[in-house]
Amino acid sequence: MAAIKAVNSKAEVARARAALAVNICAARGLQDVLRTNLGPKGTMKMLVSGAGDIKLTKDGNVLLDEMQIQHPTASLIAKVATAQDDVTGDGTTSNVLIIGELLKQADLYISEGLHPRIIAEGFEAAKIKALEVLEEVKVTKEMKRKILLDVARTSLQTKVHAELADVLTEVVVDSVLAVRRPGYPIDLFMVEIMEMKHKLGTDTKLIQGLVLDHGARHPDMKKRVEDAFILICNVSLEYEKTEVNSGFFYKTAEEKEKLVKAERKFIEDRVQKIIDLKDKVCAQSNKGFVVINQKGIDPFSLDSLAKHGIVALRRAKRRNMERLSLACGGMAVNSFEDLTVDCLGHAGLVYEYTLGEEKFTFIEECVNPCSVTLLVKGPNKHTLTQVKDAIRDGLRAIKNAIEDGCMVPGAGAIEVAMAEALVTYKNSIKGRARLGVQAFADALLIIPKVLAQNAGYDPQETLVKVQAEHVESKQLVGVDLNTGEPMVAADAGVWDNYCVKKQLLHSCTVIATNILLVDEIMRAGMSSLK
C-alpha cells in the first residue's frame, strides 16, 4: 500500500511504471496536437472558444495559450513552451515535439529495465555535447539587411502563407532597422502595431512615423497639414476642479461673473502661449502647426486654436507620447511656462483618414524617426490577429539575430548535425549512460522528420537522404520542403536564431529529465479530503 494512503485514505496515487506511463502519454498527446503545425508547410488549427469565437492559427504559442489543458503534465510542458516564446519569441512547437520525443525514446529503454536516473545522466551529457556542436556550427556575420531578410522570412513563413510572408518580411526588417540605435538595446515597443479592418493582409505597410487612432475634435480644423511643427504636451487645457474641496461665497452677481472670468482666463492664457509660439515659428510661411495633448482640451480652447489654423488632438494615449518625441523629435512638455522653438518636433505631413466611423491621424515623412508604425490591414478579425501574431514573432527573430550577432542553419540541418555528432560521441562514454545519449540523438531527429512529413514526403526516406548528404558533403544539410531533397540550408538562406536553439536544448532536457524522474503522482490536496 502507498504510504500516502496511510495518511489520507481518499488520496489517489499512481506509482513507478504507472506514473511514468501517465506522464509519457500526456507528453505524446500534446506532441500529436502540435506535430502538424511545424514548419512552413504546417497545417492550421481552428480553436473554438466557449462563446463560439473562432481563431485560426498555426502558431504553437497561440495554440498552447488558448487551449484548455487539464492534464497536469501536459500543462507543465505547455507552460515551458510558452515561456520559451516569452524569452526568445519562437521555438514553441519544436519544444513540445522534442520533449515528447525524448520521453518516447527514454520509454523504450526503461521498458527494458534501464533506470530513469541513468537515462537522465545520458541526457545531461548529450545536452552539453549538443551545445558544443551549436557553438561550432553557428555562423557569425555582420547583420546586414539581406541577412536579416532571410532570418525574418524563415520565421514568418512558418506562421503565414508565403505571399504574405514576403510582404511582412520587408516591413518587419525595415521597422527594426529604423528603431535600432547604436549602443542601445533594441526596444520593440517603439514599433507601434496599428490595425485597420479593410483591404488584404498583403496591403500591410510600414509608416515612417506614427498613426494615432483618433482625429481632431473640431469641425473647422484642417484635415491635412504639410511641413508641420508638432508640439507634444501633457498639460490640461480645460477647467479642472481644485485638488482641495474649496467653496466660495460671493455677495453679488458681479463677483460671480469675475470668478468665472478668472477661471476662464487661466486656461485662455495657456492657449494664448501656444498661439504666440505658432505665430513666432510660422510667421510669413505656410508651415502647419499641430498640438498633441495627453490631457483634455475644452471646446472653447479648440475653437481658439482652430481660428488660428492650429490642429489639436486631445487625449493621446500615454504609450504614444514617448513614441511621438522619438518619431518627430522635440520634447514632451508638462508646462507652458518656458515654451521655446526647441520643444517642437517636425513632420512633413499630418493628415486625418476616416474609415467607417473610425478616424486615424497619420504623422508621416519624419526625418530619421526612431519610432515607426506597422499598419496591419486585413478583411476580417481572423486575418488581423494572424498577421499581428506573425509580426510579433518576426520582430523578435530579427532582434535576436542582431543581439546574438550570429545564426544557425535551419530546415532541420542543425538537428541532423547534432544527432550525427552525438552518435560519434556516444562511443567515448562508458557504461549505460551512452543509451541516454543515443536516445537524445534519436529524439532530435523528430524535427527534420516532421518537417518532411508535413510537406507530404516520406519522413524516413527524406531523413536517410539528408544524413547521407551530410556525411558526404561535411556541410550542414537540411530538408528542401519544395522537393523533399537535401539542400545546404545556408546557401538557400534558411536561418534560425542561435538563442532559440540554445534555449530549446536547455529547457527540453530539464523538463524531460524531471518528468522521467517522477515515480509517484499523488492527488492528495485539501479538496480530496471532503
UniProtKB/Swiss-Prot annotation:
Keywords: ATP-binding, Chaperone, Cytoplasm, Nucleotide-binding. It comes from the Eukaryota. GO terms for biological process: protein folding. Transmembrane segments: none annotated. Disulfide bonds: none annotated. Component of the chaperonin-containing T-complex (TRiC), a molecular chaperone complex that assists the folding of proteins upon ATP hydrolysis. This is T-complex protein 1 subunit zeta-2. The gene is CCT6B.
